[in-house]
Amino acid sequence: MNIKSLSTVLLVGLFCMSFSTIKWYNNLEEAKKIAKKEHKYILLNFSGSDWCGPCIRLHKEILENEIFQTFATKNLVMVNADFPRLKKNQLPAAQQKLNDGIAERYNSQGIFPLTVLLTENGKILKQWEGYPKVSTSQFVDEIKLLIDHAE
């Protein structure tokens, strides 16, 4: 293999490694254990994945954005409490029960989307109702600032 080919392979590999895909949890208690172990904060997102336009937009434009993903992979444990409405998308009863319990504690008013930044113990640091009115970079910067002030 010549130098040019090797360089191309290495660059492609580095590019692929630089884009991280977030692991989403659907059990808050499990997420708390991981957050404690890894010394991270928890970002809890309430969504209606098949009926809530702003929820879908939030996922596509911010939570799936490379800037957010890079930050979240290093600093956050991500939890999604989804409340789909279409019969074909219904969650198993056990998951619905878990999500209902999370909503009872953190989203009793049923706001969608609702994003909540939590400490590793589940203490609320900040809530965002609806779709953020800022860019992905500004959203990440706000979370960084909240984390810095919490420590």
Residue map of PLM features:
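A short beta-strand-turn-helix
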Residues: N26-I42, A72
